From Swiss-Prot:
It comes from Saccharomyces cerevisiae (strain ATCC 204508 / S288c). The keyword Nucleus applies. Its EC number is 3.4.23.-, 2.7.7.49, 2.7.7.7, 3.1.26.4. Mg(2+) 1 binds at D667, D732. This is Transposon Ty2-GR1 Gag-Pol polyprotein.
Amino acid sequence: MESQQLHQNPHSLHGSAYASVTSKEVPSNQDPLAVSASNLPEFDRDSTKVNSQQETTPGTSAVPENHHHVSPQPASVPPPQNGQYQQHGMMTPNKAMASNWAHYQQPSMMTCSHYQTSPAYYQPDPHYPLPQYIPPLSTSSPDPIDLKNQHSEIPQAKTKVGNNVLPPHTLTSEENFSTWVKFYIRFLKNSNLGDIIPNDQGEIKRQMTYEEHAYIYNTFQAFAPFHLLPTWVKQILEINYADILTVLCKSVSKMQTNNQELKDWIALANLEYDGSTSADTFEITVSTIIQRLKENNINVSDRLACQLILKGLSGDFKYLRNQYRTKTNMKLSQLFAEIQLIYDENKIMNLNKPSQYKQHSEYKNVSRTSPNTTNTKVTTRNYHRTNSSKPRAAKAHNIATSSKFSRVNNDHINESTVSSQYLSDDDELSLGQQQKESKPTHTIDSNDELPDHLLIDSGASQTLVRSAHYLHHATPNSEINIVDAQKQDIPINAIGNLHFNFQNGTKTSIKALHTPNIAYDLLSLSELANQNITACFTRNTLERSDGTVLAPIVKHGDFYWLSKKYLIPSHISKLTINNVNKSKSVNKYPYPLIHRMLGHANFRSIQKSLKKNAVTYLKESDIEWSNASTYQCPDCLIGKSTKHRHVKGSRLKYQESYEPFQYLHTDIFGPVHHLPKSAPSYFISFTDEKTRFQWVYPLHDRREESILNVFTSILAFIKNQFNARVLVIQMDRGSEYTNKTLHKFFTNRGITACYTTTADSRAHGVAERLNRTLLNDCRTLLHCSGLPNHLWFSAVEFSTIIRNSLVSPKKRKSARQHAGLAGLDITTILPFGQPVIVNNHNPDSKIHPRGIPGYALHPSRNSYGYIIYLPSLKKTVDTTNYVILQNKQTKLDQFDYDTLTFDDDLNRLTAHNQSFIEQNETEQSYDQNTESDHDYQSEIEINSDPLVNDFSSQSINPLQLDKEPVQKVRAPKEVDADISEYNILPSTIRSRTPHIINKESTEMGGTVESDTTSPRHSSTFTARNQNRPGSTNEMIDLTSQDRVNYGLENIKTTRLGGTEEPYIQRNSDTNIKYRTTNSTPSIDDRSSNSESTTPIISIETKAVCDNTPSIDTDPPEYRSSDHATPNIMPDKSSKNVTADSILDDLPLPDLTHKSPTDTSDVSKDIPHIHSRQTNSSLGGMDDSNVLTTTKSKKRSLEDNETEIEVSRDTWNNKNMRSLEPPRSKKRINLIAAIKGVKSIKPVRTTLRYDEAITYNKDNKEKDRYVEAYHKEISQLLKMNTWDTNKYYDRNDIDPKKVINSMFIFNKKRDGTHKARFVARGDIQHPDTYDSDMQSNTVHHYALMTSLSIALDNDYYITQLDISSAYLYADIKEELYIRPPPHLGLNDKLLRLRKSLYGLKQSGANWYETIKSYLINCCDMQEVRGWSCVFKNSQVTICLFVDDMILFSKDLNANKKIITTLKKQYDTKIINLGESDNEIQYDILGLEIKYQRSKYMKLGMEKSLTEKLPKLNVPLNPKGKKLRAPGQPGHYIDQDELEIDEDEYKEKVHEMQKLIGLASYVGYKFRFDLLYYINTLAQHILFPSRQVLDMTYELIQFMWDTRDKQLIWHKNKPTKPDNKLVAISDASYGNQPYYKSQIGNIFLLNGKVIGGKSTKASLTCTSTTEAEIHAVSEAIPLLNNLSHLVQELNKKPIIKGLLTDSRSTISIIKSTNEEKFRNRFFGTKAMRLRDEVSGNNLYVYYIETKKNIADVMTKPLPIKTFKLLTNKWIH
């Protein structure tokens, strides 16, 4: 009955009622705790509605059921509960009580009290639901209340009824917990428990009773279900289920923290500063807010803080917005410094302001004029400026800067007494002007200007006028340099005075500057103040200091103006443009010239553009306009011929509402056929709807990736340059626009893609019209200039530049003016195709001409230069070093353009740039290698005249070209390679002097230097030899047998053009022969037919004698004592870098004199094809065949193709199977062999648990392993490797997430026994790790480089070890491991918490962990490109997993790093390295002996002594030691290998062990063995008896030489630079399948730090190709090592490359761009040119007998092997 009555009451279902309260929360801006009594009826009404809907299901309650609370209990209270509270409420005696509220005790320990009679304690189920209104808990126990009668007596609209209070609503979600806590605390306060609730500091007013504690516990449990509590609350209750007050305390603290964070963010977002308070106070306020947020783990970046501060700046400080608008790396300290400077300036200016400047209070903070200044003011924005500097000038809004104007004679300007003028920023106001939020542009619309008036500007420190009509005593400017607020130059043409005649006859004069590059004429109040004239903006007058009114001023718009009627005009002729003197009768420019210079634009556009100042340095009155409107340009008629006019007005009207750069039109044009592959076939154009600004981008195809790259570029450009975001892009429905890739790109960036309707091109009129206009211009420009069609896009780009600069008929401004850019500087424009002469900064010879004919295309977008096409080189360059060629017209003869010569007019227009160019030309020295702003791939090859009797020569002035009559005035359509007038073939050589000809190729420009003398160098030959001992002025007698050894026997080289160098044959007489040559481009060294003749001289080789002159064929700047042929780059330091400096200190062999009959080098690079030659694993040759060939073995495609084909077929069919698995006659054997190779497992060096402990019979070793086992277990538990609180059932976990584990045991090199618990990462599922993560370790080259630098700089070397390094890295994935089998937990799993050894991701996790710690805590930075190499100003660290090597000049710096590491990691010091005596290290397997300031020795004797005998190789420890790892002439038989499958697997396994160990040793330090190791490694799958014997021989040699060490000695302390050298070599065709072996050795300061030997990936057809391949492999690593050395040691670095191939050096030097016969090696050669020229790399020749890289490419005789290696390894 009672239950039925309760159900009939709508308030009885308290769970629903409380839920309704939750849904009816107070507004977000109101405190939920501040609910007044007036709000309660709404809560009750909503509760009634919800409860009425749930009457049919009364059993569903939000409060968990608890049958223990049905009646009072005599036991301790409260007892365990059901649900989650029951689980966590049960506490064992072993559990510690972690509550901070110890004085509350624990409810389970309390005695029973009468609090249980409280209604709040009754069971919240359908039988005894909690009442909606609960009587407050008083200090005395309340009387029992009849629940049945209670609810009928409770009013509905009051917070309290008698002693009843409103209970809190039930918690409905974890996210609402903080809000619920507020209601719950309000409930407790209303229940008379407010004085026991702790505040945010954990303080209480009194202690609560047992009854109160139980009351709080039960109410909290009733209204806060456990499964809806936040995690942090659950963690507290899991420790002590009754510790509710701790939860409340932390909740209050969190709420207050969140409120404070919100307040701080609001304060930071609403910062405002106008200078009314001190800058220091403002800085302290902002810094305090940021620091407070940082303490709450909220980091505010400098960029975000600067943006928020800048947004709130106003007044004089608003200037900083524009200054920092484009900066990406904003620093908060710099911004505060700028604010402090402006604040100090204003403070000083207010103190110094004269009384006549006192104005109305409205303007008191606007004017910042500084009077009484006799000199021009210097105002900068450098925050390092002292407070004593002069005040900053205000912004002149209308300054239009010219980015094209270059500073001339900067040194003179800097030394002059006239200082730079800085105009103010965009957002400053002139005196008396109202502040506006809109930012004025550089070029203001003419509607804002008051005609015939001067704008009065308080901030401009100088008066600027656009016309020289009022300028008196004008003189050309040569000193003053004006810059605007953006620090861009404003060109000043002249300096003079303005004379005023005011109303009362008062006359005065002020200084003024003339520049046409501004929008308004500016009148500086500062200049007037010097004449005691001030402006009164209250009466709008100019007044003298005594109050006399001189003239009225007018306010127009936002500015004040003074009429020009008070100016006295000058009586001089108009000042010329660019300081070019004019005669009294001004010559006007002919309209056809201007029409051509401005890209053949129409008459109206040109005229309107000049009126609107869209083109600077040229006015409308300067042009002869007679008959201009009727002028018909023949090129325009031909190029722009159309069928009908384009549809106009087709775009939608709503597009007008967009802001600039928000609405773009785009379209693609193309393809253009019959063009070279390097020329673009398409272009994509963009047009802005608002400004009509245009962009064009070249395209080679229409693929999605290409289009996407263009869109990415244009959007980034608009965002960064114009601070705008594109909203809509209109385009057609071509597939290049409608694809999914581009659609997704637009969607991700919030851009609307607007497509045209089907078959409606009229809706796309803007883009279509632009393409048509650009193509019309393109055709016209190409037709007018006569340039080849592959330059069509240059014409389009030129047209785009012009079109953006001209005013369209429907616009009042040009596109550039609409975009806020300066007008087009016409002095920087040349007519398209204008003939010019370009300076060659690096000619082939000093006597060769310095000028190259070219044709101007368009201004460069990336520099201040001009893009010029050079037909002779078939390329374009970006340069400023050019001269306009006079009397050259690129006009069509059929239209009789010869009568139109514009040389004088063009000179006047470009006078400024011409003077700049001529000054550069005269200042450059032709005898020095100077840097140029255009990039040639190498110096220009220009053949000179043949040698004459007079050896003296002079440099040819490029301007002398004008004296030569030129019949062709237009560039040909098809450019001839011989276009240069100076390609003169050499004449017959004087027979009296037996010179060796080094003729240059006229086809390709390539040169092959040799040890022979070229006639073009003879002029310098005599002078050079005059300084040599024993030299004379006479030519050397080449037949002398006692003087010269040319070192050239049977050597013949070929240039790219096919012209062969002299064929030098051993002969007793000097004979001159003639041989035909072939003009086919080739890098082959073989002979070929030709139509021309080349003299060939055979010279017998002579012995080298000291103090004897020798013929040097290299140019003077390339010569060295070692006949080096360098590729000197135009670097300032190149004059100090010679072959001697590169070769100095290198461990090269000391050669003895050879007899004339020595033939050791005769067969260099000759591929040997022996009659019995088989596949040689060592690439050897039969010595008997060395001297049998007297002709070159280099193959000619025409003559010897058949012969080589036969030889190659025989080679392949009979002898070349060494790289394949053994081919048994039965196919089954081959398949079995392949399967056997795949099943081979790596050599295991560790022991399993059963092997190390269970069945180990060695008790001592077993005890050590057991000890190691327990140590590993302790470490794992200490590091919390897995979750120890719970074991997981194997059947409940996804098998993919389960990783097998095991213990492995091994014995370390130092004798200690090690146990490690590892995961089976080899069977880890791919879904459980990120395959992109990398486990990085230090590269061996980085370690060797660091050791070398440490030796040269006397560094201390400290070795550290971090114990269990991987276990410091957390694991992100959910993984489980099986416990080791011996633990007996087969069906259980452990949840991993740390990166266990063996997991795929463990290495990467550890790397990221230690990297973050080193960077953040140790102040280290990782060297870019070299992972695991960290450095700061004092210490360098090389990291290899858990091993650390520290290098430092100061040992204390190392100790400081160690101290920091020990705070986080268990760091063990292996070797501190503090001794001054020899110290021994074991670093990553290398045994190092190091004595600072003396030497370093690297070896592996101990390790090899231990490991080699264990390989089961029949070593001969007492027999005769091997002196070389192999001998030439040994070959591997290629007969079929018939072997049993098991035996085959066993031998392959053996080969893997032997070659694996040899490779480890070889790449560590035994670089002399790399060739043999690499060659034998290719035969691992062919383990014949012969291969095994050779492998045993290699291992025997390693055993015999195990004591050898890599020896380094400290570099000479006098060396100021680091010298990094790569020595390269290649052996042509000595590997299977006619492949070549290449090798490189790298040396740092004379110390060998690395080597590489490998087989070329491509089949080379000549020795030159093989050498190019070797060099191309060396240069990238050389550049990377150079970067590393510069990071580790800040000394300058010299990079050198040595090769014994002169033809390779010649190809690198050549400027020839014709195709190579082999496109693969042609690509390599072209890339080499770019890399050498762009990296300041010096390329020199080294003699073959000194080339230590020879040991990397071929087997050598014992004597040669020892000679090449004994200097660096012994």
